[in-house]
Amino acid sequence: MTAPLQLLIRGQSPLIINIPHAGTSLPPGYAERLSDAARPLPDTDWHLPFLFHFAVYSGATLMAATHSRYVVDLNRDPGGASHYPGVDLTGLVADTTFSYDDIYRPGCVPDASQIDDRRQRYWEPYHDTLAEQIAAVHGRHGHAVLLDAHSIRAEVPRLFTGRLPDLNLGSCNGRSCDPSLRQAAVVALDADPTYSLSIDGIVKGGYSAHNYGIPEMGLHALHLEIVQAGYLDEANPQDWNPARAEPLQAVLRRLVDALVSWRPMAA
């Protein structure tokens, strides 16, 4: 039986939390094509639906991809445009991991027609559903807030030098949301000095933040990148670690509450 493309729990607040990289499902026949290095799916945003599960009780809509980012990357521009010029990002269908290991066995790398097929089968339906949720929330409230949630290992030399701060908030340099929304998010995330915070630093926002964040139309988007060491053991990322996750969840609760309660100022 084919897995659905997303887990979707609809809420009644203006907030939508999108988690595009936590999926681990592979379509039939895909696993056999992967290299030994790629089969553990090392670039997965592990356990983010668990980390944010509380948000549904605050009225947030929660949408999370079920399929691995190695099938297709839902936070990449399908036309190949990069939102991080000069950074060696993986593409719509990656052929190497963040550690430069080959994802596919020899002779199994997808060709252009296979990449286009994945775009049509997986990328487009997922974004159609996400756009529908944003439109529904906007129609109900007059504005919508998208939190595009991600996580990553603390050190990924391919993407950045040194250790990434614990929490990285991106607003496309202020273009994807109202300034007061970004400030509300900063205040919520900065309340606990345990976790270091960066705002529009190395992480500014990927495809979803750039595409859906149109504040002049009442559509606001933020990208949050969480260092995985803040909520799990990076040596064993497949294991959920409640002892590490719970303190971070307290910070994320403040963030979710701030985004749910935020309202644009009347013109």
Which residues fall in each region the model found?
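N-terminal catalytic or cofactor-binding beta/alpha core of small enzyme domains
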Residues: 1-146, 151-267
